[in-house]
C-alpha cells in the first residue's frame, strides 16, 4: 500500500504512515470520528476521482458518464432503501453543504431559522453567528432546560410562535438524548415552518433501526456519511416530498456545487450496502451499550454527566467538579494516546476554546470490537489521567503518562484495526 506515494512524495508517505500508527495504537473517542472499512477506503482512492460529472445520472453536462451514473444510482437507491426515503441526494460534499442546500432551497436570505444553540449542543451550521447560516439568515436559537439539560420543547414552541421561522432545525453535535421529532413537527406545523432534522451524528443508529427515524416527521433530513454511518466523508439529503426534492437538487447543482466527487459517491454506495447488514445492526447496538456503560463508569468515579446519561453514541462530561478545564483534559489525554475533544456544556462559563467539558463517543472503539468490559477499563484510565494533571496546560505526572500510554497501546493491540489487513507498510 502507498508504494507509489513513497516513491513520489516521501514526506506525505511519512504523514500517511504516522497517521496510520496514531489510529492503530490510540484510543479514538471523538464522537464524530470512526474508522471506514478498507472497501470504502479503496473506493475513495480509485480512478473515479478522474471523472467530471456535473449534473445528475442520465442528465450530465459531460460525456463518458456511463459508469459513474451507475455508481450514483446505486448510492441513491441504497440510501432510499436504508432510510425509507422517496428521494435522496448523495452529492453534498459535506454535512455543512447539505445543510446549506436545504436552507437555500426552502428559505430566502434574511428569513428566520431556528436551531439549537451551539453552547447547548447544536452545530455551527444551525445558526452560529460565525457560520454562513448565522450570516445569511436571521437566527433564533433555542436550548435545553438548565435543570434537566434536555430540550425545552415548551420554550421551542414559545420562540416559534413569537418569531415565525421559515425553518426549524432539530439535531445537534453534542446532544446525547433522543429528540422528540413528533413534537418538533407539531410546533413547525403550528407556525407554518419546515422541519429539517440534521441526523449527522445518529444516522447509523437510525439505519440500524435502534433510533427513531426522523423522516417519519421531518420535511427534510440531512446527514453526513462518515460518523456513525462509518462511510466516506460526505453529505446526504433525504425527503419524501417531491417539490422539496426538486428544489434541493437545483440548489446542490448548479446552486452551490459544480462537479460531484464521484469517488466519494461510489464509496457512499459501499457504506450504505455495509449498513444494510445484520453485522452493522449488531455494531450499532453495541455502540449505544458502550456509551451507556462508559457514562455509568464516569458517574461511579464522581464525574457529572450532562443530562444524567445518554440514549445514543455520545455523552458530555462536566469537569467543573474536578476543577479541570476541557482544554487541559483534552491535552492531557492526548499525551497518553486517548483522543477526545473539549466541549462547552449548558450554562457554560468559559470560552469554547477552553470549555468546561469533554465530549466522548464510542463509535470508533466499538468498530475495533471493544465491548462493555473495555469501556470500564477506558473510563478507569481516563480518570487516572485527569486525577494527575499538574497544570492548566494539561501536563500529566510522568509516571502516570507512561503507565497509561503503555496500557492504551496494549489495549489497542488486543483489538487491531488495520494492522493485519494492510500489506507493505510496517507499523
Swiss-Prot record:
Query: InterPro entries given for it?
Result: PyrdxlP-dep_Trfase (IPR015424), PyrdxlP-dep_Trfase_major (IPR015421), PyrdxlP-dep_Trfase_small (IPR015422), Ser_HO-MeTrfase (IPR001085), Ser_HO-MeTrfase-like (IPR049943), Ser_HO-MeTrfase_PLP_BS (IPR019798), SHMT-like_dom (IPR039429)
Query: What subcellular locations does the record give?
Result: Cytoplasm
GO cellular component terms listed in the entry, alphabetical order: cytosol
Which residues make up the annotated site Plays an important role in substrate specificity? 226
Q: Which Pfam families match?
A: SHMT (PF00464)
Catalytic class of the enzyme: transferase
User: Gene3D superfamilies, per this entry?
Assistant: Aspartate Aminotransferase, domain 1, Type I PLP-dependent aspartate aminotransferase-like (Major domain)
Record PTM N6-(pyridoxal phosphate)lysine, positions in chain = 227
Which transformation does this protein catalyse, written as a reaction? (6R)-5,10-methylene-5,6,7,8-tetrahydrofolate + glycine + H2O = (6S)-5,6,7,8-tetrahydrofolate + L-serine
For this chain, one GO molecular function annotation is:
glycine hydroxymethyltransferase activity
Which keywords fit this entry according to its UniProt record? Amino-acid biosynthesis, Cytoplasm, One-carbon metabolism, Pyridoxal phosphate, Transferase
**What is the required cofactor set for this protein?**
pyridoxal 5'-phosphate
Pathway listed for it is: One-carbon metabolism; tetrahydrofolate interconversion; Amino-acid biosynthesis; glycine biosynthesis; glycine from L-serine: step 1/1
Q: Where does (6S)-5,6,7,8-tetrahydrofolate bind?
A: 118, 122-124, 351-353
Q: What is its main location?
A: cytoplasm
Q: How does it assemble?
A: Homodimer.
Biological role: Catalyzes the reversible interconversion of serine and glycine with tetrahydrofolate (THF) serving as the one-carbon carrier. This reaction serves as the major source of one-carbon groups required for the biosynthesis of purines, thymidylate, methionine, and other important biomolecules. Also exhibits THF-independent aldolase activity toward beta-hydroxyamino acids, producing glycine and aldehydes, via a retro-aldol mechanism.
Q: Which family does it belong to?
A: Belongs to the SHMT family.
Task: Tell me the protein's name.
Answer: Serine hydroxymethyltransferase
